């Protein structure tokens, strides 16, 4: 079975693995004159630009080139405080136009030092035609600690290399990447500028240098888990502050689990009872992060959000995202671990920097499905892959029509039992049936089957308006409609912690309030179903 981008909710990580790390070597002073000890190098951005008309503070987060010092501490000094000051935490504050040098010294060994040039300008902030921001939480898709190096797939390194393989992208297009979430990266140093490797112990922000087709390091940050609203909000603010464009796309890249959220960080776990769980970034946290970032920007919406993850094309998610994004692209089904084919759709932006989402996003769908069609043709494997595009301006109509339908169904134990029967009989269920997801149209048809008096036509029409493009190479007996419905199953459910009553009852989890009330009131959640 091929590896996919499905978020496994019940992943148990032994404490010994959670606490293990790299072997640390202390710097040992030579005992003889002829013994030479290679000092570590401080890796940090070589040049820092601060625009007084944009974000006037930026942080320096130096990293040692090896692990010779545990929890290294640095001192910072500005050569010209009238131009820019620097705090003990490395926060640089632009004051006036000019140039200053920031000296960075390792406190435990003053021979280890470097200098960063800071250029403070007062310029109109650059505006671009197109910016795509990749939030890459690589997890075990990049490095699996239980495998030998020869067995590693390095799927996220492959993703980045696909992006870099597209040459001659105009300077009016910016491709940004934040990296984190895994225990090790395998990106070759020859593809990087400003660092010898992608750090596994720090969050890092990069932009594609369109001239050299390399990743240029922009910022190195102290590690904060990627599956947090604050981390994601700061990422969005970075893009809005420094790379605002006519069109701005955001890509969530990592594992997905439907209503349970997306991206989980292998560097962070939460202990519940005797089990360790990776936390996810919930949909309401994605919305909260977008709200915060947009509030401090010159715009009120992003052009689109994409999920290069498993099973994220869910109606509940779409209704929440509709407040801050115009379009959404995702898969109803598990995605194969190789993810999107970036080298096949990016040329469309290269050739037309004003390409509309109605044209670009279907191209992403088709590029993703292309290799899967090839597998079907060669007979290697039956392909179960989907990808679809939603026009989120149509989401409110789906909310209204579905809430009206549930009103007719009734919020009661009897209604819940009807819904459960319909879900169990739905022809298309997704994510190995563990996430309570099924094709929305299929669920509606089955609901009408158990309650013939229900009229589902208005809801189906709303779905057809919402889904503006879909593609699949699946072998389902009925073609998926392009968006999933969520129903918390009562048996064999692994949502117990991640999406139990405490989570799905959250008023920010969905706009299908009638359906939500029925599921939370009459659904049976509990550990006994694992």
Q: Can you say where each PLM-predicted feature lies in the sequence?
A:
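Structural recognition of the beta-strand scaffold that forms the well-ordered cores
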Residues: 131-136, 174-179, 248-252, 303-307, ...
């Amino acid at each position: 079975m091929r590896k996919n981008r499905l978020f496994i909710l019940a992943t148990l990580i032994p404490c010994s693995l959670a606490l293990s790390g790299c072997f640390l070597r202390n710097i040992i002073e030579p005992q003889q004159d002829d013994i030479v000890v290679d000092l570590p190098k401080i890796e940090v951005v070589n040049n820092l630009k601060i625009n007084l008309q944009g974000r006037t503070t930026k942080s320096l987060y130096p990293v040692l080139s090896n692990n010779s010092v545990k929890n290294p501490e640095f001192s910072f000094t500005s050569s010209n405080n009238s131009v820019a000051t620097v705090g003990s935490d490395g926060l640089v504050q632009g004051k006036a136009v000019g140039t200053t040098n920031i000296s960075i010294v390792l406190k435990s060994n003053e021979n280890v030092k470097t200098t960063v040039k800071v250029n403070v300008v007062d310029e109109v902030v650059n505006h671009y035609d197109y910016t795509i921001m990749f939030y890459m939480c690589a997890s075990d898709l990049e490095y699996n600690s239980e495998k030998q190096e020869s067995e590693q797939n390095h799927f996220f390194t492959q993703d980045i290399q696909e992006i870099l393989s597209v040459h001659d992208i105009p300077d009016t297009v910016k491709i940004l990447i934040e990296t984190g979430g895994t225990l090790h990266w395998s990106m070759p140093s020859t593809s990087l500028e400003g660092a010898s490797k992608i750090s596994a112990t720090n969050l890092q922000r990069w932009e594609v240098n369109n001239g050299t087709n390399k990743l240029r390091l922009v910022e190195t940050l102290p590690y904060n888990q990627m599956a947090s609203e604050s981390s994601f909000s700061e990422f969005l603010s970075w893009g809005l502050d420094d790379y605002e464009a006519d069109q701005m796309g955001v890509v969530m890249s990592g594992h997905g689990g439907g209503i349970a959220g997306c991206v989980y960080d292998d560097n962070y776990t939460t202990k519940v009872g005797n089990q360790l769980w990776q936390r996810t970034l919930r949909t309401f946290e994605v919305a909260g992060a977008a709200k915060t970032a947009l509030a401090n920007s010159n715009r009120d919406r992003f052009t689109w959000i994409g999920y290069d993850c498993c099973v994220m094309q869910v109606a509940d998610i779409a209704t929440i995202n509709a407040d801050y994004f115009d379009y959404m692209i995702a898969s109803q089904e598990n995605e194969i671990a190789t993810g999107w084919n970036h080298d096949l759709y990016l040329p469309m932006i290269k050739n037309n920097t004003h390409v509309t989402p109605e044209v670009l996003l279907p191209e992403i769908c088709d590029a993703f499905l292309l290799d899967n069609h090839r597998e079907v043709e060669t007979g290697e494997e039956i392909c179960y892959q989907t990808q679809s595009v939603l026009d989120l301006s149509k989401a409110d109509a789906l909310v209204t029509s579905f809430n009206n339908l549930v009103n007719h169904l009734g919020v009661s134990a009897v209604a819940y039992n009807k819904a459960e029967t319909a879900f169990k009989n739905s022809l298309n269920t997704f994510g190995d049936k563990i996430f309570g997801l099924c094709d929305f149209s299929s669920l509606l048809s089955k609901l009408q089957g158990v309650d013939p008096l229900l009229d589902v036509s208005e809801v189906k029409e709303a779905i057809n308006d919402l889904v503006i493009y879909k593609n699949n190479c699946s072998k389902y007996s009925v073609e998926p409609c392009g968006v999933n419905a969520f129903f918390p199953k009562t048996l064999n459910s692994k949502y117990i912690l991640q999406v139990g009553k405490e989570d799905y009852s959250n008023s920010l989890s969905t706009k299908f309030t009638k359906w939500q009330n029925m599921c939370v009131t009459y659904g049976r959640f509990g550990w006994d179903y694992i």
